[in-house]
């Protein structure tokens, strides 16, 4: 049976977990979640119906370790798991480079860095996937499958990851501004606020689908 260990099950870690479970990529009995405390680990495990990891030792036998923690927490997590020689590590921590990840892990560990964006939480994200030096084609395909469950993805160089991350990461904020402006205009001409927001959002959503198709 597959074993997956997720460090950090907040907004993005939770989106990855929920999306992969919903798409049937993972089974609940395969998943272990590790938070900053045993209590938090148990709470998140209970919320998603998965296992709680108390000390991260599951990294030793895990098929995949996902780092979904804040960048300042990453060094401690890498130190914690490196002694277990994890086979594959996927990090979504912003600004933590492949060089830093690979340098802190055993030489044989396959590493991939991913930059998702917030719409992943509703299954419409855009993720940039940058494979490390040792990442196998099979691991790259696995990363593509995971983030396809959350929207769209693209395999890029690490430099392109930062560039695409800036575009898709900041992009939703600009879209929100446009939606608000359109909704305000709708209210000014007499529409109820709720209807104006819905119409504005659907208009942008439809336009985006036309571009993609």
Predicted segment positions?
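NAD(P)+-binding Rossmann beta1-loop-alpha1 motif at the extreme N-terminus of oxidoreductases
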Residues: 1-54, 124, 187-189
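A structural micro-motif
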Residues: 2, 29, 50, 87-88, ...
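Hydrophobic packing within well-folded, soluble alpha/beta domains
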Residues: 4-6, 65, 90, 143
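Short, well-ordered alpha-helices that flank and scaffold nucleotide-derived cofactor binding pockets
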Residues: 14, 18-22, 46, 79, ...
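Small-residue helix-packing motif on alpha-helices
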Residues: 31, 41, 74, 192-199
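Rossmann-like NAD(P)(H) cofactor-binding subdomain of soluble oxidoreductases
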Residues: 38, 47-48, 56-129
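Internal alpha-helical scaffold of NAD(P)-dependent oxidoreductase catalytic cores
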Residues: 100-110, 126-164, 176-213
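Aromatic-residue-lined binding/catalytic grooves and analogous aromatic/hydrophobic interfacial grooves
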Residues: 171
């Amino acid at each position: 049976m597959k074993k997956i260990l997720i460090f950090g099950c907040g907004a993005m870690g939770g989106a990855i977990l929920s999306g992969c479970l919903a798409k049937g990529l993972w089974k609940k009995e395969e998943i272990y979640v590790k938070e900053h405390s045993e209590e938090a680990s148990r709470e998140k495990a209970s919320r998603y119906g998965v296992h709680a990891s108390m000390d991260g030792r599951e990294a030793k036998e895990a098929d995949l370790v996902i780092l979904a923690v804040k960048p300042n927490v990453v060094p401690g997590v890498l130190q914690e798991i490196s002694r277990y020689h994890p086979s594959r590590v996927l990090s979504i921590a912003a600004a933590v480079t492949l060089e830093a990840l690979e340098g802190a892990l055993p030489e044989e560990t396959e590493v991939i860095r991913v930059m998702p964006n917030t719409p992943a939480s509703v299954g419409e994200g855009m993720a940039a996937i940058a494979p490390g030096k040792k990442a196998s084609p099979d691991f790259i395909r696995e990363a593509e499958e995971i983030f396809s469950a959350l929207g769209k993805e693209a395999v890029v160089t690490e430099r392109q990851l930062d560039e695409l991350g800036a575009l898709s990461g900041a992009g939703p904020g600009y879209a929100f501004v446009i939606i608000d402006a359109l909704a305000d205009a709708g209210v000014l001409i007499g529409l109820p606020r709720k209807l104006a927001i819905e119409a504005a959002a659907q208009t942008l959503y439809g336009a985006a689908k036309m571009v993609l198709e």
